[in-house]
Amino acid sequence: MNRCNIRLRLAGMTTWVASIALLAAALSGCGAGQISQTANQKPAVNGNRLTINNVLLRDIRIQAVQTSDFIQPGKAVDLVLVAVNQSPDVSDRLVGITSDIGSVTVAGDARLPASGMLFVGTPDGQIVAPGPLPSNQAAKATVNLTKPIANGLTYNFTFKFEKAGQGSVMVPISAGLATPHE
């Protein structure tokens, strides 16, 4: 082999290696700056969510069965949610809930311990409210409707806590339990 032939082979090899490196860099950089599909997933629950300072409200929903076009005024429906206190040392208390669709009555122990949870209402299909066995005391929130409501729509609710303050969120009607197919 002569020197010319060796130089051509080296040049061809260098070009080939450089093009492979460029291709690898281009392929690995294609996803740069993009948000992955799993980065912002929301929980698969019926209700909405709200954060008021250190208090997180999760799976907020109206629990009612709609048998006609609307759930009529005068009927009482339950409001179900889970409140989580992220403060490690400050307890809080649910002072009240207001809504445009009716008056909301909160009964039971509405205290929210530091780093603890408060269950409001009993979800469909459960006999007792979820929570630790020694202190299985959930509060109950009942909405006495003054306006008709319907599935598929959301309704404004304002939650007021003693220390965290207040916040508003649009709340849906729960889809409820599915009836078994026969």
UniProtKB/Swiss-Prot annotation:
PROSITE patterns documented for this protein: PROKAR_LIPOPROTEIN (PS51257)
Superkingdom, natural source: Bacteria
Signal peptide: 1-29
Lipidation (N-palmitoyl cysteine): C30
Topology of this chain in the membrane: Lipid-anchor
Covalently attached lipid (S-diacylglycerol cysteine), positions: C30
Main location: membrane
One cellular component term from this protein's GO annotations in UniProt: extracellular region
Compartments (UniProt record): Cell membrane
Alphabetically ordered keywords of this record: Cell membrane, Lipoprotein, Membrane, Palmitate, Signal
Keyword set includes Disulfide bond: no
Protein name, as recorded: Putative lipoprotein LpqE
